[in-house]
């Protein structure tokens, strides 16, 4: 179904899966497996979670990538809340998947969060390959800044900049 599609950027991946991801009322985590030319081999839903979380363990994530003989993959999940900003859990998941991909030789090209008509791309924000601590610092997070799942801004003097863009 996706075999004629080539993915060169976050917008391409979102265009392919926008309809699929918009049908869920809870978080869904999946991967797009790609061949050496960037053509889509398949899309696999790794997990269907709750309203504000979805587990993505490397074991389940890489199962179809390995079976499909993928050269690379793009992780993608939705935020039904409408806020595309990554949570601390999203940062940790990305770091783990990136490191696992390096170990087994399947390159992680991006992790994209889709929320209504906005997206957040880890690649476009230069967060792939960063440690959890580095990514948190780059996003201006600290332990007291924001609980993204509750959208509860704490009054600690830290300003919050939305690192999202409209996906028209």
Label each residue range with its predicted role.
Residues 1-41:
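Long amphipathic N-terminal alpha/beta scaffold segment
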Residues 4, 71, 143, 159-160:
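Low-complexity, intrinsically disordered short peptide segments enriched in small/polar/basic residues
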Residues 12-15, 37, 47-138:
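Active-site-proximal loop/helix of nucleotide/amide-processing enzymes and allied scaffolds
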Residues 31, 111, 160-162:
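Generic short beta-strand
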Residues 137-154:
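Primarily interfacial, aromatic-capped hydrophobic alpha-helices that serve as membrane anchors
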Residues 154-168:
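Non-Sec secretion/translocation targeting segments of pathogen effectors
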């Amino acid at each position: 179904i996706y075999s004629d599609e080539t993915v060169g950027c976050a917008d391409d991946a979102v265009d392919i899966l926008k309809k699929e991801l918009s049908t869920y009322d809870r978080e869904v985590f999946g991967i797009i497996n790609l061949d050496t030319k960037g053509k889509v081999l398949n899309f696999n839903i790794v997990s269907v979670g709750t309203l504000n979380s979805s587990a993505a363990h490397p074991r389940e994530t890489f199962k179809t990538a390995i079976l499909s003989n993928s050269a690379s993959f793009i992780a993608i999940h939705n935020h039904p809340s409408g806020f595309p900003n990554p949570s601390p859990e999203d940062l940790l998941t990305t770091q783990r998947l990136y490191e696992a991909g390096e170990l087994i030789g399947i390159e992680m090209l991006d992790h994209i969060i889709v929320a209504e008509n906005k997206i957040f791309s880890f690649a476009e924000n230069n967060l792939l390959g960063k440690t959890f601590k580095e990514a948190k610092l780059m996003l201006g997070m600290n332990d007291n800044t924001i609980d993204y799942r509750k959208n509860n801004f704490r009054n600690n003097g830290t300003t919050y900049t939305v690192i999202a863009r409209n996906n028209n």
